[in-house]
Amino acid sequence: MDTILLTGLFAAFFTTFAFAPQSIKTIRTRNTEGISVVMYIMFLTGVISWIAYGIMRSDFAVLIANIVTLFLAAPVLVITLINRRKKHV
C-alpha cells in the first residue's frame, strides 16, 4: 500500500469511529442533554451526500466509511428527537 492510501484509510477510520463513544453512551443512557439537533441534522445531511457521491463515483472506501458513520450518528439524532418530543408532551 502506498502512503496516500494509508493516509486516507487512517483518516477514514478515525473520522468514522469518532462517533462511536457518543453513540454508545447515548444508546446506553438515553441522556441527550447538550446534543445539538441542528449539528446532527447538518452532519447527517453531509454523510448522506458523501454516500451518494461514493455511489456515483464507485468509491467504495468513501461509501463504506460513510455508511458506518450514518449508522453510528443517526441513533444519537433519533434518540435526541424522541427525548425532545417527550419533554414537550
Curated annotation (Swiss-Prot):
Protein name, per record: Sugar transporter SemiSWEET
Membrane topology recorded in Swiss-Prot or TrEMBL: Multi-pass membrane protein
Taxonomy, superkingdom: Bacteria
Role description: The homodimer mediates transmembrane sugar transport down a concentration gradient. Transport is probably effected by rocking-type movements, where a cargo-binding cavity opens first on one and then on the other side of the membrane.
UniProtKB keywords: Cell membrane, Membrane, Sugar transport, Transmembrane, Transmembrane helix, Transport
Membrane-spanning parts: 4-27, 35-55, 60-82
GO molecular function ontology, one term from the record: sugar transmembrane transporter activity
Effect of residue 66 to A: Impairs sucrose transporter activity
Outcome recorded upon mutating residue 22 to A: Slightly decreases sucrose transporter activity
Outcome when changing residue 53 to F: Increases sucrose transporter activity
InterPro entries from the UniProt entry: PQ-loop_rpt, SemiSWEET
GO cellular component: plasma membrane
Subunit structure: Homodimer.
Domain PQ-loop: 7-59
Effect of residue 21 to A: Strongly decreases sucrose transporter activity
Organism this protein belongs to: Escherichia coli (strain UMEA 3162-1)
Subcellular location: Cell membrane
Effect of residue 57 to A: Increases sucrose transporter activity
